Amino acid sequence: VSTESIRFSKDKNVYSLILYCDRLEMTRLLKQMGAFNAQGSGTLNGRVPVIYSDGNIKFDNGFLFSTPGIGGKIMIKNSDRIIAGIPMDNPQFTQLDLAREALKDFDYHWAKLVFNTIEDTLDMKMELDGKPSNILPFEYRKEFGGFVRVDASSPGSQFQGIKLDINLKLPFNEVLKFGNKIESILN
């Protein structure tokens, strides 16, 4: 990660800078931002405009993307966050459940992350194009017009390709402050 030169002044409280990112490990970044507990391979590149004001960090249309032609693998352990708070009778629940299951072990051709701050919340959009490594416990049912989760007696479905769009809202500054408090306690 690099940036252009910047001058810090004791009289100034607001700073704007652009972070230029080269080959950041995607899974490590997701962990550090408090999004997911992920493992895997693959790197991201891009630029992230940052505004630092009164101890808070804001992102302004930052983006990171995988190197064209070089994919990776992502295995998310705490994928239950995707369906947390969504009632099972919600029409979108099955789509989110399918995405959650796919992200447990997903091979992607390309990935993109977009960062924006809305008030005190980090709005992160993650786009992945690829396919699940394993057969998923879902089958297409014509009467429902979509996929439904099935039990172990069904063969499930082998997906040839899926584009996943995941929207996350994270209390980023709170996570940073909490991490700093723990660090100061441990030291």
Where are the predicted features?
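Small-residue helix/turn framework positions
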Residues: V1-I185
